[in-house]
């Protein structure tokens, strides 16, 4: 399949699942470049409303009628084979491209492509780098897996050769990209509905690194042994970061009352500058270092790096302050992997409060089943866990695992855990349990945020 972003502007492109965070960004890039765009999704959303206003033809529901006048159909890995639009496109020889291939074809039109990969932190790192490059007037095109206030959403159209995007390993999607700078934040066991094990995942990240040209750069975190090994084997230029034994390091770290870090940035033994982040948590020091490494490659001046990071508020759903009611602070976070949950709860410890209520909604049956033991060890920093039913997303319930099973295992390890089966049930429990100066975290990649929003709106 082929698509030339510059030459194919007379084509009409249809997106199956256009309401997704990545697909909507790609659709917006085309709309802003003069393309005719259509798309379908299963329910209405604010994203779809924005795309309509930009000129896209939007359909709610999937039907072959939606694609009878299109030249190219773009679909995601989450679209099932029995989707009627996908079937019609195949039967009628309409050109098809998956999302990753399509994004790769757009990247071809840029020289300085930055692809940010890793099991955790991609959106935050992309947000930080976006802030820096905008401060430095590099005028980048940006595709981010979350809503970022500084660009007014999940995409930005630039007019320069700089292109910044997240690079997801699910179904080897990022192997369709053309990175000049590749970032590997970390490697972890995830997407085990597709990968056999962590070794296969690591091998795929190695293949991603091999995509970088010899004059390009691979940036990686040396505290992750698998990333360190890929850095060692890389054929391109490399730049490592970490707390020690790396090219770029953070030293003399302290935290303020909001949980945000201040530290000195060193390259080898030379101090470059000192910095205070506006994103809380120790893990965000590493995210900042990765974005600093990219900035150094592009010769961004230190003042722009400092300003970009100190003013970066991050993307929505990344330890996002939602509000306060009756003295209870509500924060929402996208964490859905045990490592991410631990980082989120560790961050919450740095904020003065009494009890931490963690409302967690597991995301997919496969992840809950394959990482079950890891999930049972992820919540020790929460005073109470309110455990919702599993959010199925792209899967069907096989009956092999449930939130009740996870609740039993957590209670067996001494975690105070209450199972609930709806947003309203979670809300009622919290209304009766949370007290002034408590912290309420809604955690997960599904729709658990609704619980926090309803809690904030109680009595209105």
Swiss-Prot record:
Pathway this chain belongs to: Cell wall biogenesis; peptidoglycan biosynthesis
Reactions this protein catalyses: UDP-N-acetyl-alpha-D-muramate + L-alanine + ATP = UDP-N-acetyl-alpha-D-muramoyl-L-alanine + ADP + phosphate + H(+)
Keyword annotations from UniProtKB, A to Z: ATP-binding, Cell cycle, Cell division, Cell shape, Cell wall biogenesis/degradation, Cytoplasm, Ligase, Nucleotide-binding, Peptidoglycan synthesis
Protein name (Swiss-Prot/TrEMBL): UDP-N-acetylmuramate--L-alanine ligase
Family: Belongs to the MurCDEF family.
Enzyme Commission identifier(s): 6.3.2.8
Keyword Cell cycle attributed: yes
PANTHER family, A to Z: UDP-N-ACETYLMURAMATE--L-ALANINE LIGASE (PTHR43445:SF3), UDP-N-ACETYLMURAMATE--L-ALANINE LIGASE-RELATED (PTHR43445)
N-terminal signal peptide: none
Any one GO BP annotation for this protein: peptidoglycan biosynthetic process
MF term (GO), any: UDP-N-acetylmuramate-L-alanine ligase activity
Top-rank EC class of the record's enzyme: ligase
UniProt GO cellular component terms: cytoplasm
Binding site for ATP: 118-124
Protein's gene: murC
Species per Swiss-Prot/TrEMBL record: Clostridium botulinum (strain Eklund 17B / Type B)
Cellular compartment(s): Cytoplasm
Main location group: cytoplasm
Job of this protein: Cell wall formation.
